[in-house]
Amino acid sequence: GNGSDEVLDLIFRVFCEPREDNVIVLPPTYGMYEVLANINAIELVKIPLVENFQPNVKEIVKCQDAKTKVLFLCSPNNPTANSFNASKIETLIKEFNGIVVIDEAYIDFSIEDSWLGRLDEFPNLIVTQTLSKAYGLAAIRLGICYASKEIISILNKIKPPYNVNQLTQ
């Protein structure tokens, strides 16, 4: 996509119905999730991180309902810089009824492994990355989305044509 923000916006547009659905975020976290929720008229459910800036798995699972479509996990997290515990993430992917997005914009600064190698295990998992941070290439505006073939096919149907410029390609 034209930056990770476009990829995140496409996820809202594909999986959420405006003025009906909600998504879950874990503050403190990347502020663009809230901006995109507002732009797309999607309710934002905030479940704060707990001790050591980790997800409150029980609360997240408890708070989802039929209208909860996406869970955003920014790991490594912006602004706290920590990665979420892998077993907590795995539990959330398995117990969350919608799409789980792991935003790995800062993965190149982490000692933890990316979730890319586990995409085939979880059909509800989307991993996003960027070249803006570790590679210092923010100006080329390249956001990367990894997911099942089915999810990528749907996202490709609604993305604008020619959204990635020639230099970036």
Residue spans of the language-model regions?
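PLP-dependent aminotransferase class I/II
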Residues: 124-169
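Short beta-strands and strand-loop turn motifs
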Residues: 44-48, 70-76, 100-103
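Conserved acidic residues
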Residues: 21, 69, 125
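Active-site pre-lysine segment of PLP-dependent enzymes
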Residues: 38, 55-66, 79-134
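Short beta->alpha connector loops at strand-helix junctions that form conserved
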Residues: 27, 46-51, 104, 129
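Phosphate-binding glycine-rich loop
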Residues: 1-22, 40
